C-alpha cells in the first residue's frame, strides 16, 4: 500500500477538498482532464486531491469496463492506469484505448518486474510508474505526458476556425454563434472537433464512431445521424440546408468552412 502518498495527501488536505475555491484550483488556459483508473479507494482519493488542487479535472473509474466507457464519453487528456483491475487486466484496457485513441497513458502499478514494464510499454503505454510512488515524481511525469500529448495533437493550422455561421476554438474547446457561446455535450463536441480537425476532408463513418464513441460502437451508424442533426440545429443557419456540416451519402461526413 502506498502509505507515503496517502499520508501526505491526507495530512496536507484533510477533508478540505470542497473548501478549495475555483480561483485557487483553476489553471491558466484550457483545463486538463485526467482519467484515474484504479480500484483502491485510498489511491484514488490521494490522486483526486493532489490533482484537483493543482487545477486538473479528475474523473475516476474502478474497473476496466468503466475506464473504457469513461474514455469514450469524456475524452480525457491523460489516463493514469492501474494494471490490477477487478474485471480485466490493465493491458487489455490499454489495448482497448489504443484501438481508437493516442491519448497519453501513464501506467501506475505495483508490478515491478521489468517484463511487466516492457509489456505495458510495448502495448502503448507512454510511461510506467511503480507503487509505492512519490506524488512529486508522478506529477512531473503527468506534466511531461500532457506536453507530449499537446505536441502530438498540435495542428499547424489556426486552431480557431471561422465560418459564416459559427466559430470553433479548438484549443479552448468552445463554439460561438452570433457572439454567444453554444453549449455542446461532450459527444457533440467530440464529433464536431474531429470533423473540424479534418476540415475539407471526408471522415468515414466507422472512423468517426471509433474516435468519438469507441471501438465497440463502429457499427452504430444511427448515432451519427442523431448527433449530426443536433449539431446542425445548434450551429447551421438553415439546418435543413447545411453549408458546413455535410453528409457524403454512404461514405461519411465532411466539415466545410
Give, region by region, the residue ranges found by the protein language model.
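Conserved acidic segment of CheY-like receiver
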Residues: 30-42, 47-51, 79
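Short hydrophobic/Thr-rich beta-strand motif most characteristic of the beta2 strand and flanking loop
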Residues: 55-62, 70
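Active-site beta3 strand of CheY-like receiver
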Residues: 74-80, 85
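The short loop immediately C-terminal to the conserved phospho-acceptor aspartate in CheY-like receiver
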Residues: 40, 57, 83-84, 111
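Positively charged, aromatic-enriched patches within helix-turn-helix-type DNA-binding elements
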Residues: 174, 179-186, 190-244, 249-251
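Short, Lys/Arg-enriched segments at the junction into DNA-binding effector domains
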Residues: 30-33, 144-202, 206
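Acidic catalytic/metal-coordinating carboxylates
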Residues: 62-66, 89-92
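Basic, amphipathic DNA-recognition helix from helix-turn-helix-like DNA-binding domains
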Residues: 89, 95, 99, 104-161
Amino acid at each position: 500500500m502506498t502509505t507515503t502518498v496517502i499520508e501526505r495527501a491526507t495530512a496536507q488536505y484533510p477533508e478540505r477538498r470542497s473548501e478549495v475555491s475555483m480561483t485557487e484550483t483553476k489553471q491558466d488556459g484550457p483545463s486538463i482532464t485526467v482519467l484515474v483508473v484504479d480500484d483502491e479507494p485510498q489511491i484514488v482519493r490521494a490522486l483526486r486531491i493532489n490533482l484537483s488542487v493543482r487545477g486538473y479535472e479528475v474523473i475516476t473509474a474502478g474497473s476496466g469496463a468503466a475506464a473504457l466507457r469513461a474514455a469514450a464519453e469524456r475524452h480525457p487528456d491523460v489516463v493514469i492506469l492501474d494494471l490490477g483491475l477487478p474485471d480485466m487486466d490493465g493491458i487489455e484496457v490499454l489495448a482497448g484505448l489504443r484501438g481508437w485513441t493516442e491519448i497519453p497513458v501513464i501506467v501506475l502499478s505495483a508490478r515491478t518486474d521489468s517484463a511487466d514494464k516492457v509489456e505495458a510499454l510495448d502495448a502503448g503505454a507512454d510511461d510506467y510508474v511503480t507503487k509505492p510512488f512519490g506524488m512529486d515524481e508522478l506529477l512531473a511525469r503527468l506534466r511531461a505526458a500532457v506536453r507530449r500529448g499537446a505536441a502530438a495533437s498540435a495542428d499547424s493550422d489556426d486552431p480557431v476556425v471561422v465560418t459564416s455561421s459559427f466559430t470553433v476554438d479548438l484549443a479552448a474547446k468552445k463554439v460561438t454563434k452570433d457572439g454567444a457561446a453554444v453549449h455542446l455535450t461532450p459527444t457533440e463536441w467530440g464529433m464536431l472537433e474531429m470533423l473540424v480537425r479534418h476540415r475539407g476532408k471526408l471522415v468515414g463513418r466507422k472512423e468517426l464512431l471509433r474516435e468519438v464513441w469507441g471501438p465497440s460502437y463502429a457499427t452504430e451508424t444511427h448515432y451519427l445521424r442523431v448527433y449530426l442533426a443536433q449539431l446542425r440545429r445548434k450551429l447551421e443557419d438553415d439546418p435543413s440546408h447545411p453549408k458546413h456540416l455535410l453528409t457524403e451519402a454512404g461514405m461519411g461526413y465532411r466539415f466545410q468552412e
